[in-house]
Amino acid sequence: MALVRWRLRRGNFHLLSRVLLLKLTVVIISVLLFCEYFIYHLVIFQCHWPEVKTLAHGDRQKPVLKAMFLADTHLLGEIRGHWLDKLRREWQMERAFQTALWWLQPEVIFILGDIFDEGKWSTTEAWADDVQRFRKIFRHGSHVQLKVVIGNHDIGFHYQMSKYRIKRFEKVFSSERLFSWKGVNFVMVNSVAMEGDGCSICSEAEAELREISRKLNCSREVQGSSQCEGEQRLPFSAPVLLQHYPLYRASDANCSGEDAAPPEERNVPFEEKYDVLSREASQKLLWWLQPRLVLSGHTHSACEVLHPGGVPEVSVPSFSWRNRNNPSFIMGSLTSKDYALSKCYLPFEDRVLATYGAAAVFLVVLILAHLERLPSSFLFGWKLRKMHMRG
């Protein structure tokens, strides 16, 4: 009789073990799917394109261009990039980017520099590997255009940059500086070359910008017809200036918001030509291009600044968890005359980690709850075995 009872309890033990294993598997898979996939849909689904005025132009309304702006992706390289850090950060950016494409369907995407973390010193082989990973993470359909601006981590600071690194970057991402679509002009500046010291790279970059300025002036019909004769006219629209370094500002003291720099860092003075462009370079860009809007990266934090002449600048926070807990990107609805911007936050890293922590606690409680139901089966079997051994 005792042996029958022991066999029943042993069968019950195996059943409880299988039930526990099934529950653990379901919980673990559910948490992984939520934290690594569904959470991106849940968060980005709540983002919406801002509305912009579409004033009638004759019998037609002005077309609206939907543009996404993100910055400082900092794909890790072979020197400073631990494999686990790479895996975690790049998966986060890939899921965020692909989910944003799915829900928001932008027409053009701009990345405002520091695409890579080690472009300034990477070897040819390491560069090729970084580019391959970039193309996988930021893959997109042919109906979407992706434009990239040079950052200091892509080619090095002014004293590190070389024509070789610039050509290597432009071979992959194009050397285009002026881009027009749906009546909206974008000027993409290599802000690393705005040192103003007369170096050959800097002189070429400034000459390019002066030529773009001339073309923009022709579209405004500022210059005489002789200077613009035979020129293919750009859309009559003040440009949007895109660059990595922000225009000159003393610090982030006037920046606010949950994704601005931490309070203890906001009053730290910025260094010209390192944290921001110099006063002189900033004045040149504003004078030459007369932009209606400036978007920049580099600081990894958000800020909105109003420059002389009423020109607004938006500093776009980093897109990567590696640089901040609450990454985001900017959504812009633009016409040739007007624009509207809104911000779309990505999942916060600490909340994802908290979800994993809560799941781990739940698993421990679940295991302990099942173990409390098992000792009687073990004890009964142990006693029965001892009785047989004595017999």
From Swiss-Prot:
Segments crossing the lipid bilayer: 25-45, 352-372
GO molecular function, one term: manganese ion binding
Biological process according to GO: endoplasmic reticulum to Golgi vesicle-mediated transport; GPI anchor biosynthetic process
Chief subcellular location: endoplasmic reticulum
Disulfide pattern: none
Topology class, membrane: Multi-pass membrane protein
Keyword rRNA-binding carried by entry: no
Entry-linked Pfam families: Metallophos (PF00149)
InterPro entries registered for this protein in UniProt: Calcineurin-like_PHP_ApaH, Metallo-depent_PP-like, MPP_MPPE1, PGAP5/Cdc1/Ted1
Function: Metallophosphoesterase that catalyzes the removal of a side-chain ethanolamine-phosphate (EtNP) from the second mannose of the GPI-anchor protein intermediate. Participates in the glycan remodeling steps of GPI-anchor maturation to allow an efficient transport of GPI-anchor proteins from the endoplasmic reticulum to the Golgi.
Subunit structure: Interacts with GPI-anchor proteins (via the GPI portion). Interacts with TMED10.
Protein name according to UniProt: Metallophosphoesterase 1
Species, as recorded: Cricetulus griseus
Gene this chain is encoded by: MPPE1
